Amino acid sequence: MMKSLFVTGNDTDVGKTCVTASIVKNLRDMDIDVGVMKPFASGNRKNSNSLSQDVEILMKYSGSHDPIDLVNPYFFEIPTSPYDASKILGQKISLQKITDAYDKLLLSHDLVIVEGIGGLMTPITQNYFVSNLISELDIDTIIVIGSKLGTVNHTMLTYEHCKQMHLKLKGFVINQTEPNGYELSNLKQQIMELTNQTVYCTIPYQKNFDLDLYIDNFTNFVDFSNFGFKDV
């Protein structure tokens, strides 16, 4: 039985937030009480009172009313890694704050979906990376991958690091973020053959992007029973 899931990527800008929002929306539709967490977010706020766009999306589609300091313990107003941002802004990162927030969310919900920042080797502190956080949370993981040329290399590097860290990898989601690059069925076949892992779905490119339509497409392409969520 899966109690939580960490959504990471093989690169930045591969659509982790869209995939995470799709998962939590479908879980809500299955009458599962799902919590969301994005331990680290970065970028510009829409205004002084708003959250990061990614966090707003996750809270909207999950229906979350949890305190923001649990859902998103750290927000940096510069688009860089937590390690780099904390140095630039002089803001110390407490790893205990992250794990405590996760534990509290887990007590309040059937399960928690956690969206990472960047990829597995994105630094949180000088000697602590996203992969270390996943390992410490002891949480199942899926990897969102794009479809641009070079994706297979990036995916295999990510996969090998998962094995090195003994992470509990559930499989992959292929998200076509641009019209060019790998043909989706070919990419899916390669990833399955090279990793011997599940590819849950391939989401085709959407020229005029609409998140609600994306979530509908995700629902059509994914059999959620494969995730093990129905055992919750």
Predicted regions located by residue number:
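N-terminal phosphate/diphosphate-binding loop that engages ATP/GTP or pyrophosphate donors
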Residues: 18-92, 103-104
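Inter-motif core of Ras-like GTPase G domains
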Residues: 125-148
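Conserved glycine(s) of the Walker
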Residues: 14-15
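Phosphate-binding/switch loop-helix module in NTP-utilizing enzymes
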Residues: 81-124, 131
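C-terminal lobe/tail of nucleotide-utilizing enzymes
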Residues: 160-232
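Residues at the beta-strand->loop junction immediately N-terminal to the Walker
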Residues: 8-10
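Extreme N-terminal starter segment of soluble prokaryotic enzymes
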Residues: 1-6
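Charged helix-capping and loop-helix junction motifs
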Residues: 126-132, 156-159, 184-189
